[in-house]
Amino acid sequence: DFYLSIDLRIQYLAHRALQAGIIEFKAKAGSAVVLDALTGEVLAMVNQPSADPNIRGLRKPEFFKNRSVTDQLEPGSAFKTLTVATALENGIYKPESTVDTTPFKIGTKLIGDDRCQGQLDLEAILIRSCNAGAAKISLAIKQEIFCDTLTKLGIGEITASGFPGEARGELGCYENWRPIKQATLSYGYGVSVTSLQLAKAYSAIANKGIVNQISIEKIKEKPNGERALSESTTANLLMMLEAVVEHSVSRAKVKGYRVGGKTGTAQTFSDDYSGDAHNAFFVGIAPISNPRIVTVVVVNEPQGQKYFGGQVAAPIFSSIVSGALRIMGIAPDGNVKS
């Protein structure tokens, strides 16, 4: 017998939360994935707009896309977590290490932003989402080490989930990276991922460094995953991601539970990055005290003044996770600020 891993209750609430968010922010499209952090099972996977063969107006070909596995997107700052993970795992930086986040140039390209100046530790770099800090961390890592760690996390690799039309994404390890490539990759430009790949990578952080095979079939036995990160690395990352939500992404908070995650906002590429269209991300883990689910929310091209991941994707994450944890019977944490 074949039993799907999809939990219809979580699937339904994810559909409703994503649909409401797409309408509220007048977005072109969106997707959400919920993974069981311990097994790699897909608990929910939803897309907007979604197809309905019974309604003529909802039969458009693009409505049948499973965006979570077919769409390859630059993840923006959500990738900074993986940059920090690589540096910690390979002993290049320690959690308490500081980095000069003052904007700097590579050739004619200025790397930096107005959020960061001076020496900051790794947690603060994630909280403030410092491009210059992430870039300098990345440039201290040898290319082969960076590629090897990211590949172990599933970046640039087919997840073999069983969903048709799955894209591989693009990491580009076959190239001889120039410094500008490695710098921009650190904050999620020049690399493309699917939502499912991003969820898989973060699941290693949630699962004490073990990467499991993604499955749409309900798993009967405990999976034998492969180690990508050490337990000490993931313990530090979980604390950092919780601090990100606590200090800079209040819309991602879930009442009664400790959660962690990272936003991402990336300009869409046409001929260049000069346009006004953006993709907004939030990738989160819950509960931080004993991780059980990893959730990725992507909102494509929201319209209006709100287009950052923390503004549009984070509240959708909060809505999905709030319901999912209760459906799964996961007890709330005590003394949690909401």
Residue ranges and their predicted role:
Residues 19, 23, 242-246, 322, ...:
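Short, intrinsically disordered, mixed-charge
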Residues 1-30:
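Conserved, well-ordered alpha-helix/loop/beta-strand core segments that scaffold catalytic motifs
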Residues 1, 296-297, 315-318:
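Small/polar-residue-rich segments within soluble enzyme cores
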Residues 6, 32-77, 82-303, 309, ...:
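Beta-lactam-recognizing serine transpeptidase/beta-lactamase-like catalytic domain environment
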Residues 14, 125, 317:
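A helicase ATPase "motif cassette" and its flanking acidic/Ser/Thr-rich regulatory loops
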Residues 222-225, 314-338:
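Short, gly/Ser/Thr-rich active-site loops of penicillin-recognizing serine hydrolases
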Residues 7, 11, 198, 309-321:
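Short, charged, low-complexity patches
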